[in-house]
């Protein structure tokens, strides 16, 4: 773990220490509910790309899948951190918009569960990282809205150039933001390459959120909860609370996942 990550993860961080007594922090990860086939079976499943669990484990945490069920937000009281994972599109009805023909993969049960999880995590001050769809969920949970199909807005498909895989594009990170500190660039604004696969993005920012990274075409690529700083809980109790539109678990740079786990460990240290 880098010096910058330790500095910005939160107070009380110590290498190799998560929960009090040296236990590893428990990180809940929101998941899909889909039909899947394996071996002789074809059944309704709760699933998640393994790279999420592998990244949390490599960062020193214990990953726990959170199925999209009513009342799952009660799990927040038993977690040290939360990842709002990627997935299909959020139902535009959640932010008062009509359905765009390009909006796809809507799962109302997942929307309801993750919006409740996001709100509960912020209220409790749980260390929280939104990834891709997770950023969009966090924004909608705070009353924001989404662009439903970016090619219609920016005139290209550079944010989702590969079907079934990830492309790459640079993002500009705001100097002196929490994100810049985690990535080791707390000074002047810098550009970093990120793995990308999304066709929706933030339109109107939700209450208490600030944008901290953008692509050259103006699309918001990261948000942070205002007042959630390295010195502890901020407004509405939020401590480490940020989200990115890209997929850090799919890339080589794992500093965001390490910072989340470190911040989660500080809650029980």
What are these regions (language model features)?
Residues 1-129, 139-142, 147, 151-186, ...:
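N-terminal beta1-alpha1 cap of cysteine-dependent amidohydrolase-like domains
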Residues 239:
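Conserved loop-to-beta-strand segment in the C-terminal subdomain of adenylate-forming
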Residues 135:
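The feature captures the ABC ATPase H-loop/switch
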């Amino acid at each position: 773990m880098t010096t910058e990550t330790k500095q910005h993860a939160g107070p009380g961080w110590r290498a190799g220490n998560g929960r009090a007594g040296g236990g590893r922090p428990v990180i809940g990860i929101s998941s899909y509910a889909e039909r899947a086939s394996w071996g002789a079976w074809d059944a309704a499943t709760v699933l998640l790309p393994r790279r999420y669990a592998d990244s949390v484990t490599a960062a020193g945490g214990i990953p726990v899948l959170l199925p999209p069920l009513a009342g799952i937000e009660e799990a927040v009281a038993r977690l040290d951190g939360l990842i709002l994972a990627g997935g299909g599109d959020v139902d535009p009805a959640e932010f008062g918009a009509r359905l765009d023909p390009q909006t796809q993969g809507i799962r109302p049960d997942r929307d309801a569960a993750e919006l409740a999880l996001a709100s509960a995590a912020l209220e409790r001050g749980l260390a929280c990282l939104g990834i891709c769809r997770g950023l969009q969920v966090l924004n909608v949970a705070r009353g924001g809205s989404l662009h439903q199909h970016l090619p219609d807005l920016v005139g290209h498909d550079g944010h989702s150039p590969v079907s079934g895989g990830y492309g790459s594009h640079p993002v500009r990170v705001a100097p002196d933001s929490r994100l810049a500190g985690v990535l080791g660039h707390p000074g002047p604004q810098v550009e970093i390459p990120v793995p990308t696969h999304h066709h929706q993005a933030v339109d109107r920012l939700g209450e208490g959120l600030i944008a901290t990274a953008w692509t050259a075409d103006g699309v918001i690529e990261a948000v942070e909860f205002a007042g959630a700083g390295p010195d502890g809980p901020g407004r509405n109790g939020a401590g480490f609370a940020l989200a990115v539109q890209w997929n850090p678990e799919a890339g080589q740079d794992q500093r965001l996942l390490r910072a989340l786990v470190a911040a989660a460990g500080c809650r029980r240290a």
